[in-house]
Structure formats: structure tokens, C-alpha cells
Amino acid sequence: AARLPLRLAMREAMRSVSFDRKNFDFGSMGGYYTFDEVVDKLDELHLFFPELITERTSIGTTLEGRAIWMVEISNNPGVDEGEPEVLYTAVHHAREPQSMTTVLYFMIYLLENYGSDPEVTYLVDNRRLTFVPILNPDGYVYNETTNPNGGGFWRKNRRPNGGGSFGVDPNRNYGYEWGRDNDGSSPDPDSDVYRGTEAFSEIEPASQRDFVEGRDFKLAFNYHSFSDVLIYPWGYDYSLFTPDSSRYADYGALLTAANDYGYGTTDQTIGYIVNGSSDDWFYGEQTTKEKIYAFTPEVGNREEDRFWPMPDRIEPLAKANIDANLTLAWLAEGFPTVSLESVTDRKLVCDALQCGNDYVDPGEVMEVT
């Protein structure tokens, strides 16, 4: 009989309800939410689930005066109880609305299933889950203006560069190996991968830096689209691997077990390099903060989906990443290296995953009370 990864087998045993997503709907921009609709949705979720999600809080204000909103989900949201912290972000690049939808969809999944799904309840009770659904609101709103029905192709923020040029790529402006070469980013202000005048010159990555350095995140997903891959450091070099490359690969296998994404470094997955990226800074900067295992899920395929998947693809793509998002939250408490035949206490789920192998056979008892 086929052997199942322990976390996946345990997850199926723990899940007791299906997701009816009554708080999820489609936006007015080709099925995607506008910036204002995202703000309204965050307010609505806090109104309906005030005991589980914080009010939106700004981590920075853009050049055009828009807030970069953040919310937390936990059983005591906004309170530092020393629980493992996990971060989910989206829309570094303005033309990638599926990244935002995927994050919001997961938030709704957690809120609607808390108290009825044992896994969701355990994670919300024992994690501090933080969400930044739109990191680049100025670029996002620019696409709303030019293409109100969706399909806008603007990528960068809206920094005036002079001479009629606009925008810096937020995901080339982080401080780790910023501007290492002109292959992984560009010094040309007209380029889509323009890195800016200096590291953290842009409000969006600088706000994220300041926010992250004040917290204790263990892992992070920085959502993008597209390619159906999960990317991890290093991004800045074709041949270098992190000291934690084996662990990254193990994490990658777990995180993609349900959606079958490819996983690896930037070069291994999409065939080019990036410098000044979020993931390299999250992991590589270990002086101002502890290292964070950061990943970039690239949602959607190259053939059908690309930057603006059709409306009938929006929910399937978001749903395909629920398992990865849950697994990321599990990993904040430790890497699974063990086998377990029976779980009788939810707290033992993570404690017991510290010995043995990480497989169970179909038919073995997986009981959670």
C-alpha cells in the first residue's frame, strides 16, 4: 500500500468539516478585489470574528498616501503570548492579484473553521499568524485605474524616477545582496526589475523590514504569481546554496505535497536569479533579527493562468494552497522527523513529531481529541 506523509495523513484524520466559504466572494476587478474592497473585507472579517482577527493596522504609508495593512489571526489576536509566529504576504508586484486572493482565502478558511476543525483550532490557538495582503498598494491601484476590469500589467511601485519614468521593483530593493549584479536586478529605471537607488530606498520593503525586525517570525510565505513552484533562497546566485539547503528541500517537499508544485532555489525553479529579494533578506539577514525560513509560492501555471487567471480559476488556485499554508504554520513548531500511529491529544501532534520516520500506512489509527 502507498505510504502517506504523516502530516497529510494526520490532517485528513483531523479535518471534520468542509469549507463552505460563506465569507468569500469575488471582486469587481475581473473577479479580483480592488484595494478598497480588500480594506472592506478586512473590516468585515474583524466585525464577524472580533475574537479571532485584529483590526487592520498600518505597517507603513506609501508615497501616494496609502496604508500597507496588516492583520493577525490567533485565539487572542494582537497579544504576544510567545507563540510561534508565521507571516503571509502578497502583492509585492502589482499585477499579481491572485497572490492577494490566495492569502485572503486562507484567512477566511481559518476564521470559518475555527472551533469545528481540530487542525485549524489547534493552529489558531497555538500560533500568531500575521497577514499583509497587499504590500504594494500604489502599483495595485494604478492597475485598477488603467484596467478597471482587470488585466493591468504594471509591476512596480509608483516611485517617480524622473524623465517620465516610474517605479521600483519592491522585490529587488531588499538589503541582502542588493545590487550584487545587473543580472538579478537592473540599474535602469525603465526596467521592470529596477532595484532603486539604494537598498530599502522604497517604503514598501522598508516598512516590511521594520515590521519584521520588531517581531519573531519563524517562517514566511511571500506570495507571487505565476509558475506553480515554491521558491526558496538563495535567489542571488546560480550556484550557491544556503547552509540550510537540506532543510529547505525537506520543507519544500512537505509544503508542496498537496499541490504538487515544483520547489527549489530561484534558478532551479524559474531559471533566473534575483538580488535584493524578500526571501534572501528574510533568511540572510541575521544581525538585526533571527533568520526566517522564507518561501515564495508562485501561484498559477504558465500556460493558462499567468498574471490574471480567469474568474473560474481564482478559487481553485487559492484552494490549492490551503494545505501549504497550514503546513507552514505547523512547521513553526518544529520539523517533522517522526512516525506516529496514534495521536490522542492535540498538543502531542507537534511534541510527538520528534522521533521515528515521517510516514504512516493507510489504516493506522489517527485519533485526535
List each language-model region with its residue ranges.
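Extracellular/luminal regions of secreted and cell-surface proteins that mediate adhesion/ECM remodeling
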Residues: E315, W330-T369
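Active-site-adjacent structural elements in enzyme catalytic domains
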Residues: A2-R158
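Intrinsic-disorder/low-complexity accessory segments
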Residues: A1-T34, R302, I314-F335, L340-E341
